[in-house]
Amino acid sequence: WNEISDDLGQRFEISFNTYKPFACGIVIHPSIDACVQLRKMHQLQAADIAKVTIRVHSLVLELTGKKTPATGLESKFSVYHSCAVGLLYGQAGEHEYTDEVVNRPEVTALRARVEAIVDDRIDEAAVDLTIRTTDGRDLHLVVEHAIGSLERPMSDAQLRAKFVG
């Protein structure tokens, strides 16, 4: 019973809410964040990418393991689709989760090159991403906490871009 009354009037759960930068399930956010970061760091284009390997917590595949979504709604539950649009477009907003985008040839082609592996060492808020480029390089990034998390909240500029454009 102490759990109910501990910190009563001092701790407010609402203060632990954050804004989601991406229009999909929260467990996918670290993967998108990593894809967007590597895309920007290395000016990646889809033609540069031979394979994408994400090492994730088991919950990621349990909740968002849909490999070939057919609709915008299904794509919101696909870590594969989310990685593909993050790499292709550098974002994963509402527009990237539409029926039209899900079926674009460049999206389906890149989505097919994404491999997700469950790794018990990875926290549900993290991802270990490796991109193998067509010229043989391995680009690697670990994201412990995605943008939009309590540990890495969105900046005012990012919030303006999300809501105002």
Pin down the residues of each PLM region.
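Terminal-appendage/accessory-domain detector
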Residues: W1-G165
